Swiss-Prot record:
Zn(2+) 3 binds at residues 78, 105, 136. Its cofactor is Zn(2+). It is an enzyme of class 3 (hydrolase). It holds the Pfam family PHP. Zn(2+) 1 binds at residues 12, 14, 78, 197. HAMAP family: YcdX_phosphat. Belongs to the PHP family. This is Probable phosphatase Pcar_2586. Gene3D superfamilies: Metal-dependent hydrolases (3.20.20.140).
């Protein structure tokens, strides 16, 4: 399918700091520039993930330049949901970041997965203005009431991520859920984000499958929060 949608910023990328990713921030920025991106978000895993960085890593994100290789660098985290409205980084650290993703992951402190409890956890998180994006919500290991989540996204302005990796290598069984989420987002005009979930530089800006799903669902361009650098800055409440 030919895509009529786009994203100038990749809002979900991991560096060596995540422990199971394989490129430096400089390598990622260089590849992002080569692929024509105007921005890339460094969203290494929160500390509850095995081999993830210590919280002090996130304390020191200010050391990263705002621009590398001509690409805007957004400094953030992919936090782990650990309970209703709870993630594995303190609010004082979340406040320091340009953006915060939140998602369910194995072995990270979340209890037994059940649709009602999972949905409650996400809906409460979306009330927190420090949480910008719910990442890979189509993961079948953590079922959700997708309609309730899409409605909440529209109400709170929290973006739901279409994660390209969910269609390819990760979270087997996610693809149909992601397509349904895209349709619900189109129905309720919920904000969506695109992320490669790259764990190596060569995967940065890989959006093809996610874009196809958004096109098929009838998502309007203005629903994609990272369609341009300017819309990304606006979504994150950043002026420059």
């Amino acid at each position: 399918m030919t895509s009529t949608l786009k994203a100038e910023v990749d809002l979900h990328v991991h560096s060596l700091a995540s422990g199971h990713a394989y490129s430096t921030i400089n390598e990622i920025a260089a590849e992002a520039a080569r692929r024509g991106l105007r921005g890339v978000a460094m969203t290494d895993h929160g500390p509850n993930m095995p081999a993830a960085p210590h919280p002090y890593h996130f304390e020191c994100l200010y050391m990263i330049p705002d621009h590398l290789c001509g690409v805007r660098i957004f400094k953030g985290a992919e936090t782990n949901i650990i309970g209703p409205g709870q993630v594995d980084l303190e609010d004082r650290l979340l406040e320091k970041m340009d953006l915060v993703l939140a998602g369910f992951h194995r072995h990270c402190g979340y209890g037994p997965s059940e649709l009602q409890a999972n949905t409650r956890a996400v809906l409460e998180l979306m009330e927190n203005p420090r949480i910008h994006i719910i990442c890979h919500p189509g993961n079948p290991e953590y079922p959700l009431d997708y309609e309730a989540v899409a409605r909440q996204a529209a109400a709170t302005g929290t973006a739901l991520e279409l994660n390209n990796s969910s269609f390819v290598t990760s979270r087997v069984g996610s693809a149909d859920n992601c397509r349904l989420i895209a349709k619900l987002c189109a129905r309720f005009h919920s904000p969506v984000s695109l992320g490669s979930d790259a764990h190596i530089a060569q995967s940065v800006a890989s959006f093809g499958h996610a874009l196809d799903a958004l096109n098929a669902a009838g998502i309007a361009p203005e629903q994609i929060v990272n369609r341009t650098l300017e819309t990304t800055l606006d979504f994150l409440g950043m002026n420059t």
